[in-house]
């Protein structure tokens, strides 16, 4: 009999599910909360908001951060904004419209009930952040300003210039700091979770590594929450910070938490192109730029060749010789189509030879028209810090006038190209954000919950704060209300001792390989395999070859890795090696999932399954489910597939259309 997963979606109409859940869930008495401990791993938007909220409720929280400060979490890199259905613009937005756009943007591969709840709590997030003092942009009359993001025909994105993630994180950090000051949160900086401890079938603690001393430390709690972000760095080159890793999630997977839809990896269309083979990360240019920037390539192949050779500049190509291909193909949405659509369109143009830089892997993002229409002052007010960042990296100023012909001003365009950015897949969770391990919860990007096969722009911040501020504080109580869980466990239990010894033995194994290759050299090779075989365009043959190469690179890792130094004290290379071990396993999961899913949907594009127009072609008859993968004893064994059928009550599943 096939294994099944219980998503615990409440009964009743979709608009009433969350309300009914909150009305009937079990609660924990305020006095009893004082007796209960919760571990929260991660201090980004999801982790910081959850830790602060749970502590405010009375729980004792142990919060772990791999950086010197929670303010260095990768959430700080989010630029463009956060979605909410406030409808301040009176342009037709609503909770239902946000819900529908998110499900459609995810190519009908998300759970309806989870997405509706996300849209439902979105407005409360904005109120919470305003109360914290987040300096959202405002219109002349004082109302909060909005702009548009991809996959929407309304303006629902709230923003703080191009620094929205930073400002939201500072708001969450202020709440967290307040609870640290009261003693309700014990914050452990420069600590990394190395394993989850299971006692009587439940998550009851973690083994953490003090990254400064190198020592392993045991922590017990009544529940464990991981908020550790995505796995984009399995591709080596991505927009993720260098420290972003999937070790906590993968360790939970090894202990019995299933992974859901790992092949759903987002390629962001507006990133600064790769500049050389020594590069170690990529830089995101906010999707908000697509509000006022127009994406184009030359109409003539000879112009593209001249751009690639450096004998012609973008501003020298006249308007009539420019192909604004997104506006041409998708007139209803233009440059604001969803990210997967925009990325594939850019790849198609470059594959046809119309790329605009020396590698042929770039397209233009041009602000000439909007600067003339709105004025340079207004454009700089909206995107000034993004223009500065682009100039600092490329030495090109997108706001600088290049030439003027017959009254038409031509500015230096940006060059952009798609890159790995976000992961829609992640640890499987039910409606309560609980994994298949009782007592282990996963929130934010590290779970698979809300975005289906493609996330809409400005929805990552929304999900992280929704989970931390407004969902987990309810659902974790439903679990902790069980009085059998209230006893505090000693970290001297055999389960804790065995987990620590296993981590210690693995560290010793890695240190004693004593091969000839650095962590970075193997990681770079892994990234090349992932991008070439499991990247933007996937095929059956390419994925099969990718799996062979991934098994070979694990062998190379296990036999030829060299880690300098010792395991005692600070050893960044050792930490990176642990991350790389888990990226290899994650890469295999992505490839297995992509190979089994014989369809194209959202960020997962199988070249064998596309329409005549080159759009993603789903197979709803055979693949209308969440693909979940269960660990089988060791890293070498293929994982087992478990299917969670999707159930749609009110949205009609149909082919996505962004053309009209």
What positions do the PLM features span?
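N-terminal Rossmann-fold NAD(P) dinucleotide-binding loop
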Residues: 47
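Glycine-rich Rossmann-fold phosphate-binding loop(s) that bind the pyrophosphate
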Residues: 42-44
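Glycine- and aromatic-enriched mobile tails/lids
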Residues: 20, 25-37, 50-53, 57-59, ...
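An anion/pyrophosphate-binding glycine-rich loop and adjacent beta-alpha core
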Residues: 251, 257-400, 474-477
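Conserved N-terminal glycine-rich FAD pyrophosphate-binding loop of Rossmann-like flavoproteins
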Residues: 68-100, 266-270, 279-281
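Conserved redox-cofactor binding core of oxidoreductases
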Residues: 125-215, 227, 271-285
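Core beta-strand elements of the Rossmann-like FAD/NAD(P) dinucleotide-binding domain
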Residues: 34-36, 214-223, 436
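Glycine-rich loop(s) and the adjacent beta-strand/alpha-helix scaffold that form part
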Residues: 223-282, 451-474
